[in-house]
């Protein structure tokens, strides 16, 4: 907290110190000296005092006059119109406080007089009621006595005869008295209503006592009266809502009462807390303000903000301390309920094996599959290399086998990893003339990580340089031992070109499948994995699904990762429509709401509501993870990036034909760069380059890359107008090489020094024009004129300058070669000594590389 003295405060507000001390004394502050310290609270007190002392209220107008004028046109016969102007004037007068007090005093006196009158009236009614009660009892007592004596002496009833005429007289008197009370009650009711309008309060309640008494009297007399009448409505009955319709007829209306009542005790809420929850969400569930939760957390010693995320334990502690009931839920509860609903019931049957062909690039994986499928696939791939996962099922003489062909290029690591996870057996293709290569080792690691058995196919065995023993040795180093050497991995010599050994390879694969005893339940709902996905312009999102269990049928509602949809159509690998697909069958499905990621699990769900709920939940989780990764402004990263220069960034908008290629390119391009340059893929997707992609590239100064896709007319128009850089590729090598070249250009160039020659000083001469001249012998390289030099004494640089004069004998020379003598004049330096070395060098710019 910053503290200043009275003198400093006076200088700050530009006021004399004595005047400031006087104002502080008036404000009640204890300061008497200019050197005393003034705290922030005392400043606030002084400011409040000054505001109140200088505040002047403006005279408010006592009378406000409002005038309103409206003009209208009135048409009369003969096509004439008359203008009518209506003026209205309202005057609002503000009364003085004396008038208001006088009126309040007058109202109090009237209220007090009304209370006294009501009290006197109530006393009079009570006395009258007592007198009437006494008269009735006196009139009824003589008549009751002869009745009690009627049994022993019937003649004794004669004295009671004179009392019979008195009964009607008492009833008439009671009726007249009741009529008078009814009129008085009506008058009291009207007075009470008028008093209540002016301000009821306690007096109004007291005024209501007299009508209540009249109600009780009337109820008692109603039992005796021969012709009962309706009791007069009182103020209490009116206030309780017993108002009738016109003329007092109709049913009584229900009282309009306010619905909210303050709770008599604390309200206990059911609070549902996930693994994380924000302070605002927690406060909303407890029906309290967020500031209350923040205040409570401060009391616990944990300063938080209203948007801060709390863990489950902390949120549970806060909710329980505030007296609420807590229910802990897991973030995977929705996923768990989905897993429970997917029941696989039925008899298990044998299924075909799923075989993945893996290996180094150009080792003949696809060519081997071509021979098995009797089709030419490799020729259709750009550059002759596989850039997608291909899924095929083949009917052989020994049964059906499903093959997955994976890319061998280094960029497709994720594709190969997914292929190993979705497979039962891995065929590792190794070229006999090339041996074990980096992607071969990677394929072995993927197979081991997935726990999948290997079958090694030594391809190109018909080539002259084929060496099977070399392959066995190199794979043994990687932990893959041949059966011939006592291991458990079969090695098969094949030639994809000639077809040699293909039958033996299939036999080895089916033998491994029999050992694994692969089972599936065809009657269960379908479950599988996404092999590949793409966005077709005419058909929408298309996903290649490998069914692993159950049966997938057309019309099923499927959940695929964070996407869902109903299967509108299914196609096999040849493009023919099918109605259903059983275990180990790859199919393409149409009808999803987006392109799922390759490797996402597919499952058939019962209804669309469940699928949508889980898909939205997964999308939310993915969005949270993505935002958490992109949030680089965290406190722990601030100090790491402090002092570092900002990297140069190459922004790229990347569109590919399939999801797997997009993932592979994003991973490969993001790994390029160093501490000075980096690649950032700001936009990526599956499908053609659209107008929105071109606008994104324009806004972010990015380069547009299309991999096996093209731009539409709108995108091409924007590219031409704005001069954007858009490039098409169909081979992954080319796009990576071009990005490397672009990053190299962004690095700039380095300045490198090349030593041209070294001369040793043998003697020093004096020249009137140049000063000290060094007589030198060139001992290394060539000495050039007008080049930068360094003077070294005992191999330590003592001066750096420029060679001003170079002579051989008395003639100027442009250069002096090794082993020759010369005279050297150093510009602005005269301290040359015998034994020094003069080093001549040049600075050249060299392009930097990654």
From Swiss-Prot:
Signal sequence bounds: none
Listed Low complexity bias regions: 136-172
All copies of domain tr-type G, residue ranges: 350-517
Biased amino acid composition, Basic and acidic residues: 96-135, 173-210, 234-243
Primary location group: cytoplasm
Assigned GO CC terms: cytosol
One Pfam family cited in the UniProt record for this chain: IF2_assoc
Keyword annotations of the record: Cytoplasm, GTP-binding, Initiation factor, Nucleotide-binding, Protein biosynthesis
Keyword presence, Transcription: no
Sequence segments annotated as region (G1): 359-366
Region spans: Disordered: 50-72, 92-267
Gene Ontology MF, one: translation initiation factor activity
Gene3D superfamilies: P-loop containing nucleotide triphosphate hydrolases, Putative DNA-binding domain, N-terminal subdomain of bacterial translation initiation factor IF2, Translation factors, Translation initiation factor IF- 2, domain 3
Region (G5): 495-497
Function: One of the essential components for the initiation of protein synthesis. Protects formylmethionyl-tRNA from spontaneous hydrolysis and promotes its binding to the 30S ribosomal subunits. Also involved in the hydrolysis of GTP during the formation of the 70S ribosomal complex.
Protein name stated in the entry: Translation initiation factor IF-2
Species classification: Bacteria, Pseudomonadati, Pseudomonadota, Gammaproteobacteria, Pseudomonadales
């Amino acid at each position: 907290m910053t503290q200043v003295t009275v003198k400093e405060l006076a200088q700050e507000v530009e006021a004399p110190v004595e005047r400031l001390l006087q104002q502080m004394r008036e404000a009640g502050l204890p300061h008497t000296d200019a050197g005393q310290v003034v705290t922030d609270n005392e400043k606030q007190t002084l400011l409040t005092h000054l505001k109140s002392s200088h505040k002047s209220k403006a005279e408010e107008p006592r009378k406000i006059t409002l005038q309103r004028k409206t003009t209208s046109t009135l048409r009369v016969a003969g096509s004439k119109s008359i203008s009518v102007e209506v003026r209205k004037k309202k005057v609002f007068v503000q009364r003085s406080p004396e008038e208001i007090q006088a009126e309040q005093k007058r109202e109090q006196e009237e209220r007090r007089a009304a209370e006294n009158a009501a009290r006197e009236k109530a006393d009079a009614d009570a006395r009258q009621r007592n007198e009437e009660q006494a008269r009735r009892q006196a009139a009824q007592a003589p008549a009751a006595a002869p009745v009690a004596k009627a049994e022993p002496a019937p003649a004794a009833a004669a004295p009671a005869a004179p009392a019979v005429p008195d009964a009607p007289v008492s009833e008439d008197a009671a009726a007249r008295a009741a009529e008078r009370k009814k009129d008085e009650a009506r008058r009291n009711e009207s007075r009470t209503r008028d008093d209540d309008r002016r301000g009821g309060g306690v007096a109004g309640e007291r005024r209501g006592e007299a009508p209540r008494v009249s109600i009780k009297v009337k109820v008692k007399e109603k039992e005796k009266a021969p012709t009962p009448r309706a009791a007069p409505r009182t103020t209490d009955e009116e206030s309780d809502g017993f108002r009738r319709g016109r003329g007092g007829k109709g049913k009584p209306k229900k009282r309009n009462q306010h619905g909210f009542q303050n709770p008599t005790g604390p309200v206990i809420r059911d609070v549902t807390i996930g693994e994380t929850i924000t302070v605002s969400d927690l406060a909303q569930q407890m029906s309290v303000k967020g500031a209350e939760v923040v205040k409570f957390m401060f009391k616990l010693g944990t300063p938080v903000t209203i948007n801060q995320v709390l863990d489950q334990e902390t949120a549970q502690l806060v909710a329980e301390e505030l007296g609420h009931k807590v229910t802990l839920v897991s973030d995977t509860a929705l996923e768990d309920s989905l897993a429970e609903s997917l029941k696989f019931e039925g008899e298990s049957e044998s299924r075909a094996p799923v075989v993945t062909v893996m290996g180094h690039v150009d080792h003949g994986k696809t060519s081997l599959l071509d021979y098995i499928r009797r089709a030419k696939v490799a020729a259709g791939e750009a550059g002759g290399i596989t850039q997608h996962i291909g899924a095929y099922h083949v009917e052989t003489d020994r049964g059906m086998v499903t093959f997955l062909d994976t890319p061998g290029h280094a960029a497709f690591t994720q594709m190969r990893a997914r292929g190993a996870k979705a497979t039962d057996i891995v065929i590792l293709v190794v070229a006999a003339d090339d041996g074990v290569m980096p992607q071969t080792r990677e394929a072995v690691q993927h197979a081991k990580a997935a726990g999948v058995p290997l079958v090694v196919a030594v391809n190109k065995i018909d080539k002259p340089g084929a060496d099977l023993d070399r392959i066995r040795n190199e794979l043994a180093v990687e932990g893959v031992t041949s059966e011939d050497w006592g291991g458990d991995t079969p090695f098969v010599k094949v030639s994809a070109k000639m077809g040699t050994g293909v039958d033996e390879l299939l036999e080895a694969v089916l033998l491994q499948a029999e050992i694994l005893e692969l089972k599936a339940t065809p009657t269960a709902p379908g479950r599988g994995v996404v092999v590949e996905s793409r966005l077709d312009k005419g058909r929408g999102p298309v996903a290649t699904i490998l069914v692993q269990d159950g049966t997938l049928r057309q019309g099923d509602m499927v959940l695929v990762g964070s996407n869902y949809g109903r299967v509108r159509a299914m196609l096999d690998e040849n493009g023919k429509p099918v109605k259903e697909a059983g275990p180990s069958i790859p199919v393409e499905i149409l009808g999803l709401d987006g392109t799922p990621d390759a490797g996402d699990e597919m499952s058939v769900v019962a209804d669309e509501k469940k699928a949508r709920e889980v898909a939205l939940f997964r999308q939310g989780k993915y969005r949270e993870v993505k935002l958490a990764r992109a949030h680089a402004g965290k406190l722990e990263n601030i100090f790491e990036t402090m002092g570092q220069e900002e990297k140069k960034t190459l922004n790229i908008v990347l569109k590919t034909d399939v999801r797997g290629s997009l993932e592979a390119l994003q991973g490969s391009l993001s790994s390029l760069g160093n501490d000075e340059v980096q690649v950032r893929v700001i936009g990526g997707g599956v499908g053609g380059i659209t107008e929105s992609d071109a606008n994104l590239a324009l806004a972010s100064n990015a380069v547009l890359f299309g991999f096996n896709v093209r731009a539409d007319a709108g995108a091409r128009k924007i590219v031409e107008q704005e001069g954007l850089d858009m490039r098409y590729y169909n081979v992954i090598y080319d796009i990576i090489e071009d990005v490397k070249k672009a990053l190299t250009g962004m690095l700039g160039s380095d300045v490198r020094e090349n030593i041209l020659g070294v001369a040793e000083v043998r003697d020093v001469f004096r020249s009137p024009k140049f000063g000290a001249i060094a007589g030198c012998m060139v001992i290394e390289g060539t000495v050039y004129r007008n080049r930068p030099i360094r003077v070294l004494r005992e191999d330590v640089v003592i001066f750096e300058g420029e060679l001003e004069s170079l002579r051989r004998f008395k003639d100027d020379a442009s250069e002096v070669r090794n082993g020759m003598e010369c005279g050297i004049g150093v510009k602005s330096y005269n301290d040359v000594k015998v034994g020094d070395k003069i080093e001549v060098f040049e600075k050249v710019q060299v392009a930097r590389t990654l």
